[in-house]
A protein has these predicted regions:
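N-terminal low-complexity, acidic/polar interaction/targeting segments
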Residues: 1-277
Length: 277
C-alpha cells in the first residue's frame, strides 16, 4: 500500500506517548516510520488490541517484530526492542471461520520497548520515543545520495522477480524523501534481520547507506544466480544438440545398412549435415 506525505514529516513521526500502551507483536514484518502498512491479524490477543483501537481510533500502539516467528505468546525477550508507534486507519474483517482480519496501520515515530507491563488480555508496555536524525534534504550531498538510492532500488526491483509492480509505481510517485527511504526498507524482500538493522539506524543518512549495501549485495546475488542459470541452459542446449546428432547418425546408419557395416563417424557426421532435425 502506497501513501505519500506532504508537509513537514516531523509532524508525523515526532510522536509523544506517556505511560503504558498496547504492544502489537508481528511475525516477519518490520514497520517503519511514516509508512502505511497492511497487516493480517489472527492471534486472539492481537484482535483484542484491534477492537480497542476501533472503539477509540486515537489510541496509539507500539509495533514490535518477533525474533522468532513461531512463538505464539511472546515475552519481552522474544521481541526486538526497536519498533514504531502506529495508529489504525482501517479494519477489514476476512470471511471464514477463523475470524482473521486485515488492518491498515499508519506508521508514526520510532520507539524503544523498555518493558512489558501486562500480557493479558493483550501485551502492554512502557516505551521511549526515538527521533530519527533527519538531514538537510535540500543539500547537494543528500540529493546525490537519494539519486543513488533511486537507481539502485530500480535495478533491484527489475532483477527481483518477486517484487510487485506497485513497488515500481511507488519509487516514481512518492515525493517525500523520508517516506520513500522507509518505504524501500519496509517493502523490499529483505530479511527481518536486515530490516531491523535499517530501522535501528537513528540517522536517516546512515539508514540509506545500510539499505544501499543490502541492495548491492542482493543485486550481486541476482547476477550470480542468473549467470549460473544461463550457463546451465547453455550446457543443456549443448547436450540436446549432441543427443540429436547421435540420433541422426543412428538413423543414417539404419538407412545405409540397416545398422550393418562400419561407417566412419566423421563420414556419418558429414552425411548428417544435410538432414533436417
Amino acid at each position: 500500500m502506497i501513501a505519500d506525505f506532504e508537509g513537514d514529516i516531523r509532524n508525523l513521526i515526532d510522536t509523544k506517548v506517556e505511560g503504558e500502551i498496547p504492544v502489537l507483536a508481528t511475525r516477519n514484518m518490520v514497520m517503519f516510520p511514516g509508512v502505511i502498512t497492511p497487516l493480517l491479524i489472527g492471534r486472539e490477543s492481537s484482535m483484542k488490541i484491534v477492537k480497542k483501537m476501533q472503539k477509540d481510533p486515537s489510541v496509539i500502539i507500539g509495533v514490535f517484530c518477533q525474533k522468532q516467528s513461531d512463538i505464539e505468546y511472546p515475552t519481552y525477550s522474544d521481541l526486538y526492542d526497536t519498533g514504531v508507534y502506529a495508529r489504525i486507519i482501517r479494519v477489514m474483517e476476512m470471511p471464514g471461520e477463523r475470524g482473521e482480519m486485515t488492518i491498515i496501520l499508519q506508521g508514526l515515530g520510532k520507539c524503544k520497548l523498555d518493558s512489558l507491563t501486562e500480557t493479558k488480555p493483550f501485551l502492554k508496555g512502557i516505551t521511549t520515543p526515538i527521533m530519527d536524525v533527519l538531514p538537510d534534504t535540500e543539500s547537494w550531498e543528500f540529493k546525490s545520495l537519494m539519486k543513488n538510492l533511486h537507481q539502485t532500488t530500480a535495478e533491484y526491483i527489475k532483477k527481483n522477480e518477486d517484487m510487485p509492480d506497485e513497488s515500481r509505481f511507488a519509487l516514481k510517485n512518492i515525493s517525500n524523501d523520508v517516506v520513500l527511504v522507509n518505504f524501500i526498507c519496509a517493502n523490499m524482500t529483505f530479511s527481518v534481520k536486515e530490516k531491523m538493522s535499517m530501522l535501528e539506524e537513528n540517522s536517516l543518512e546512515e539508514r540509506i547507506y545500510t539499505t544501499l549495501r543490502t541492495l548491492n549485495k542482493e543485486i550481486s546475488l541476482f547476477d550470480i544466480r542468473n549467470s549460473i542459470r544461463d550457463k546451465t541452459r547453455e550446457d543443456l542446449d549443448e547436450q540436446q544438440k549432441e543427443y540429436f546428432l547421435q540420433q541422426q547418425i543412428k538413423n543414417i546408419k539404419e538407412e545405409l545398412g540397416k545398422g550393418e557395416g562400419s561407417y566412419d563417424k566423421i563420414e556419418l557426421e558429414k552425411a548428417s549435415m544435410g538432414k533436417m532435425w
